[in-house]
Amino acid sequence: MSKVTIITGGTSGIGRGIAEKILENSASDDILYVSYGHNTEQAEEFLHAQTEENQKKIRLLQADMSSYDEMMKFVSRVKEEASHVDWLINNVGISTYAKYEDYTFNEWTKIVNTNLSVPVFLVKELRPIMSEGGSILFTGSYAGQQAYSSSLVYGVTKSAIHFLTKSLVKELEPKQIRVNAIAPGFIETSWHKNRTPESYERINRKIALHRFGEISEVADMAYEVLKNGYMNGSVVDIHGGYD
C-alpha cells in the first residue's frame, strides 16, 4: 500500500525542505499532499523544481490555514482521494515583528488560528483515516521555550504546540499514532532576509556554533523523527546551542 503524507505550508522554507526530504526517500507509488496559501507562483515553482517522477507524487492543494472553513475544504479533498494518511506534518506558521502594544485583535487571532487552532482541528478531522502506527509531526519553535519580546504571540502559540504534542500521545494511543515536534532556533529562511549584518552578528554570538541553521539540517532531523518507531511525545530542539 502506498504511503500517504500530508504537509501544510510545504512550498517554502522549512516546510519545503521537509517535503523534499520526504520525496527524496519516497517510493514510486507514494503520495504527498502539500497545502499552500495564496502564493500560487511559489507553489508552482516548488512543483516544477522536483524531478518528473516526484512531480507525479505531489498533490498541491490551496488552503488558507488561518481559516477553519478552508481547512475543512482541504480535509474533504484529501478524504475524497485518499483512504488513509500515514504521516501528517503540521508545519504552516506565521508571525509578526510587531510589539505587544501594537498588536490588533485581528492580528493576534490570525496568528493563533494559523499556528495553533487550525492544526488542532486538522488532527481531529484526519484522525479517523490516520493509519495504525502513523506519525504526526508539529513544527514548533525554540521561541516556544525562550521568550522573545519581538515575537510574543508566535512564542505563545509554539509553546502551546509543544504542550499539545505531549497531550495528544494518550489521545492517539489506541491507534498507536506517534506525535512529536521539532523546535528549530534561528534557521536561514526568507523570514530573516531583511536582517542587518549587525543583527546576524548579535544573534550568532548567542549560538554556540556561531551561525544560523540550514533548512536541510532541520529537514534531516524532521524526517528522522517522523520515521522513528519509538519517539513519542518528544519536542526536539535544533538551535545550534542557543543561549
Model regions and ranges:
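C-terminal substrate-recognition "lid" of short-chain dehydrogenase/reductases
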Residues: 129, 211-238
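Active-site helix of classical SDR
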Residues: 123, 157, 165
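Conserved glycine-rich cofactor-binding loop
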Residues: 11-12
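Residue(s) in the substrate-gating loop at a strand-loop-helix junction
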Residues: 141
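Substrate-binding pocket helix/loop in short-chain dehydrogenase/reductase
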Residues: 99-100, 104-112, 192, 199, ...
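Alpha-helical segment proximal to the catalytic Tyr-Lys
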Residues: 128, 169-174
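Conserved glycine-rich Rossmann-like NAD(P)H-binding loop of the short-chain dehydrogenase/reductase
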Residues: 27-44
